[in-house]
Amino acid sequence: MTHGTIHSVESCGTVDGPGIRFIVFTQGCPLRCQYCHNADTWEFGCGRSVSATAIIEEAEGYRSFFEATGGGITFSGGEPLAQPEFLEAALREAKQKGLHTVIDTAGSVVPKNIDQILDHTDLVLLDIKHIDDATCRILTGRSNANTLAFAKRLADRNIPVWIRHVLVPGLTMTETFLRQTGEFIRTLGNVERVEVLPYHQLGVYKWEALGLDYPLKDVLPPSAEDATAAQELLTSYLS
């Protein structure tokens, strides 16, 4: 029986894929995003150990909500692709049970069994941290090369994708970078939706609890007008 390590679950999520969803937050992430609101999911080797079978059985308790709303199960994190064997096993069992499956990922980790994982995935929420590699390294500690290559792989397999992009003043919120992101999205052909996520500071207390210095403490969230403009700009590249 395949086991994984999770941070927590959310029984009735409504923002990580279509419908009402059972969200599994896996434990462990190789990125160190400066705006991360779940810094407590970074560390590997801690969290709750659970079998793929057990987590799908737990999700099945909400089947009536899924069927009424077109929902299902979403694997988020942390970085779910950092636990590839567990993810593949859980997704396989979910599909065997007839559940709609979503992976919420930054695509920075591409495991050897990625094609087997995608065989059981209905939708990918792909977070493009930054289209510029140098800035991405500053923002996350990692290159964006794997993310962009993963996006192209998803396009080649014609797996539906929702692109996510966190709007951070001074880092991601420039027209040049937004247009470059849009031009990349336009090349893919399988992107159903773009979601601009306005930067916020709701996770600062987690950094403080972990004894970490929050690097963006002086950065204010974008205005509603700026967020709307960015959303409209990126969405225009889907047409």
Regions found by a protein language model. Name each.
Residues 1-13, 169-239:
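Auxiliary Fe-S-binding modules of radical SAM enzymes
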Residues 2, 8-10, 14-50:
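Canonical Radical SAM [4Fe-4S] cluster-binding loop centered on the CxxxCxxC motif
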Residues 6, 30, 41-43, 154-161, ...:
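N-terminal/domain-start segments enriched in small and hydrophobic, helix-friendly residues
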Residues 40-44, 137-143, 211-219:
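Short glycine-enriched, charge-decorated loop/helix-capping segments at active-site entrances
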Residues 49, 141-144, 221-224:
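Short, conserved loop/turn and helix-capping segments at secondary-structure boundaries
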Residues 56, 60-72, 76-77, 81-202, ...:
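Conserved AdoMet/S-adenosylmethionine-binding subsite of the radical SAM
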